Amino acid sequence: MQAQKLEKSLLWEISGNGLEKSSYLFGTIHMTCDASLDDNIKIALDNTTLLVLELDMDDPNMQTEMMKGIYMKDGKTIKDLVNEEDYELLGAFLKEEIGMPITMVGNIKPFFLTAMMYPKLLNCTVQSFENELIKVAHEQEEEVLGLETIEEQLNVFEAIPYEDQVTDLLRSAKDNMAYDKETFQKMLELYDAKDLEGLNTMMMEDKNLSTTKHKDVMLDNRNENWIEKIEGFSKKQATFFGVGAAHLPGDNGVINLLRKKGYTVKAVL
């Protein structure tokens, strides 16, 4: 079943197929300048009794678990992945951007080093929709759970070869993040326009990102694994799901996968 073209919305109602109450699916962006929640999101949060994000961000062990998984396996370091010239370039770049010498951070997976620089892509104090959603859940005294464990999420990054991860980092170093800034701006514009189709096209066409090259690992496989959990939670109680917007559109996106299972998934406009 091919995905129908999606209306411009970030909030979707899941109903039918034996569900007693509707659940809601909201596409987040993990970093933005303004993460205020629209009225229709607040209403959906009022009508649900559980918040489920990609990860259970209320888990007190989250940081510790995350720290365990940020290092490359088998004692590998960036020095093993690049030539001398690129190593020096990366050294200067990391010192400038995160204030640490490469000898200290060289054993961290390149993906995480790239992620440490994400806040620099925005000229503002970074806000996150996940944090705003958690605040509301706490006010409503509701539980916050996750669709995957930290371990499962870390395995995703383990499945992408370190060579590909370091290629992304090198590109950022070579153009001083100009490409990243431009791409992220485009992504924010599409997100603010609630244009999931546009986001999907951008992800599919951006040959520079290892996320595109490894879309199956980053998005598709995870979406597939989440469906059973989304069903399980929704059957028990009205649930509000908040996941990265890139997971929603496309043939293998969460919206189409739920429709294939027989659920009605409609845009809340």
Annotate each predicted stretch with a short phrase:
Residues 1-7, 12:
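Bacterial Sec-dependent N-terminal signal peptides
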Residues 212-269:
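A cross-kingdom marker for long, charged
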Residues 4-6, 17-18, 45, 233:
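A generic structural signal for short, solvent-exposed coil/turn residues
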Residues 14-24, 29-210, 214:
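Structured, acidic catalytic/metal-binding patches in enzyme active sites
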Residues 4, 34, 219-223:
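A conditional alpha-helix N-cap/helix-loop micro-motif detector
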Residues 10-12, 191, 226:
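Tryptophan-centered motif/residue detector
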Residues 7, 37, 129-130, 223-226:
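Amphipathic coiled-coil/heptad-repeat helices and related helical stalk/stem segments
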